[in-house]
Structure formats: structure tokens, C-alpha cells
């Protein structure tokens, strides 16, 4: 998030971020823990917002279906909505595994639908990156993980596909 925050042009807005990421976390795990951890960082004196960055971890669980993943994300978003917390949902990124990507495309579409139905901003990182040469090269050289170029692409997508809308700020013109 450092790249996104560093490039955010909003001199009248003070932004603080607290990363609560857990590697390989499923949507079920996220649903169970997010409020307890995030609520300790929220304040009644500030405008509180939440970024949820989803992964492909749900694909590794045989017991988790797309419907279950949808429900888990819906529960997170519904709880946030009940507390008037705007959420920016960043979808999962593609892998180099074509079979996994086929399943991930379905999950991405489901997540987009859930966020859209609840009027939360969704940044689709999967669709623009799945065939992106630089993304794929970065994953190939980093044992399947994005490096500098990959993180730059994700930051660009976030900044240009919902970040300012979610913050309620005009998009910069330059």
C-alpha cells in the first residue's frame, strides 16, 4: 500500500493505514477475524475505511465453494456497511497456472458481484493481469510471486480503478 499512498494526491486529507494481512488467509478466516482486529484501530473521531485484498487461498480448500467464498465476503461487507465503513475490495491476482486461473476467474467474478451488489468499490486485478506479459514475466522470475514490476502494476490498477472514488476525492488530471 505504500506505493498507492505515496502517489495519492490529496493534500487536505490525512491518510493512515494499518496492514492486517495474513498470508494464505481464506475468506472464512478473514470473516472470522477482521472486525476484532480492525475495530481496535478505528476511532470515532476519524473517518474509518477498510481495504480488503483477497487472495486465491480459497481455491486450496476442498470444502470451500464459490458460494461459500461469496458468503464470507458478503458477511465482511455487510458488517462494514452496518457500521458505515466504506470498503475497497481488491480482487485476487492471477497465477501462472492456467487451471488455477480458470477457477480464479470464476471466484473473481463472484467477488465483483458481491461488492457491486453492496455498493462497495471493487478493483479487478485478475482480468487485466491474467494475460499481461510483464506480470507473467515478473511471476516467472519470482517463484510465482510478484516483484517490483508486479507490485507496480497492482498499485496502478488500484489508483486508476477505484481508489479516488472510494476516498470520495476527484481523480488527479496529471
Task: Enumerate the predicted regions with their spans.
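Active-site segments of SGNH/GDSL-like serine hydrolases
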Residues: 53-59, 76-106
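Class I S-adenosyl-L-methionine
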Residues: 2-6, 81, 112, 116
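Hydrophobic/aromatic beta-strand patches that form the interior of the parallel beta-sheet core
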Residues: 18, 88, 121-123
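Generic structural signal for well-ordered alpha-helical scaffold segments
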Residues: 35-39, 77, 159, 163
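Alpha-helical scaffolding segments of alpha/beta enzyme cores, especially the outer helices
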Residues: 36, 68-82, 106-113
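Conserved SGNH/GDSL esterase-like catalytic core that processes O-acyl groups on lipids
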Residues: 1-72
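A short helix->loop->beta-strand "cap" motif at the edges of active sites that frequently abuts
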Residues: 48, 82-86, 120
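Catalytic His-Asp segment of secreted/periplasmic serine-dependent ester chemistry enzymes
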Residues: 93-174
Amino acid at each position: 500500500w505504500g506505493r498507492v499512498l505515496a502517489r495519492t494526491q490529496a493534500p487536505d486529507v490525512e491518510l493512515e493505514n494499518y496492514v492486517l494481512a495474513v498470508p494464505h488467509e481464506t475468506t472464512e478466516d478473514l470473516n472470522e477475524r477482521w472486525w476484532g482486529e480492525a475495530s481496535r484501530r478505528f476511532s470515532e473521531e476519524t473517518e474509518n475505511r477498510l481495504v480488503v485484498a483477497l487472495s486465491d487461498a480459497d481455491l486450496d480448500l476442498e470444502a470451500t465453494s464459490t458460494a461459500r467464498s461469496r458468503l464470507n465476503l458478503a458477511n465482511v461487507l455487510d458488517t462494514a456497511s452496518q457500521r458505515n465503513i466504506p470498503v475497497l475490495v481488491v480482487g485476487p491476482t492471477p497465477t501462472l497456472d492456467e487451471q488455477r486461473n480458470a477457477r480464479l476467474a470464476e471466484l473473481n467474478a463472484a467477488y465483483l458481484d458481491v461488492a457491486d451488489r453492496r455498493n462497495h468499490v471493487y478493483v479487478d486485478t485478475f482480468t487485466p493481469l491474467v494475460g499481461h506479459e510483464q506480470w507473467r514475466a515478473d511471476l516467472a522470475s519470482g517463484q510465482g510471486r510478484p516483484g517490483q514490476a508486479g507490485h507496480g502494476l497492482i498499485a496502478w490498477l488500484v489508483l486508476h480503478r477505484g481508489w479516488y472514488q472510494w476516498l470520495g476525492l476527484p481523480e488527479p488530471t496529471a
